Design a protein with these regions (language model features):
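Alpha-helical transmembrane segments of integral membrane proteins
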Residues: 6-14, 48-52, 71, 93-100, ...
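Small-residue-rich transmembrane alpha-helices that serve as helix-helix interface/gating elements
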Residues: 173-185
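Transmembrane helix interruption/hinge and helix-loop junction motifs
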Residues: 8, 60-69, 106-115, 165-174
Length: 195
């Protein structure tokens, strides 16, 4: 019994840590698009954001390597989906980095682990696009809910989350449980307002 509780706590902490690493990096990369009354945690960390992101990811990778690797790589691959033929700092086109990230995840943790992480990340991303539909219409790049339609994006997001649940029930359920806490901490609601 106690080993089961320990494992569940370890898994939750691993998911929180990798989720926070992904969110910090995403907020850092999207800092030009940030608005609102409060500074997110990534902005408050300033130049230290990369160090704290790596620290958070390292903790997750130590606690639950296969989940940390595949969730991070799936987030990276999904983040590159819209970049198509753009040349990235690596010199590679975005589509090739997407394929390489997915292949690395499959090699490191197996197809089922990588597929479940990819389905989870894409499902969450689609729902995020649905929720942010009104806000994101002012950005230069349309999100998927704007391209496909809100209902279509919501249905696709739900289907992907069910696929993730089928492939990796514990990771998906715990991930959905941890996600609001990651978003809360990353939003840093306890801090200063923009001035």
């Amino acid at each position: 019994m106690s080993s089961g509780i320990f494992e569940a706590c370890r898994d939750i902490l691993a998911l929180f840590s990798v989720g926070l690493a992904i969110k910090l990096m995403d907020d850092h990369l999207d800092r030009e698009e940030a608005d609102g009354a409060r500074l997110p945690l990534a902005a408050r960390l300033g130049r230290g954001v990369c160090a704290y992101t790596v620290l958070s990811y390292a903790l997750a990778a130590w606690l639950k390597p296969s989940w940390a690797w595949t969730l991070f790589l799936a987030s990276y691959a999904c983040g590159m989906l819209g970049s198509g033929a753009w040349r990235l700092p690596s010199g590679l086109p975005g589509w090739l980095e997407t394929v390489l990230a997915f292949a690395l995840g499959v090699t490191a943790a197996g197809w089922r682990e990588m597929a479940s992480s990819t389905a989870f990340v894409m499902g969450v991303q689609l729902w995020d696009d649905v929720v942010d539909f009104a806000h994101d219409r002012y950005l230069t790049r349309a999100n998927l809910a704007q391209r496909w339609g809100r209902v279509e994006a919501a249905l696709a997001g739900t289907a992907l989350l069910f696929i993730a649940l089928f492939l990796a029930a514990a990771k998906t359920l715990l991930g959905l449980l941890v996600l609001p806490w990651v978003l809360y901490v990353a939003a840093a609601p306890w801090g200063k307002e923009r001035g």
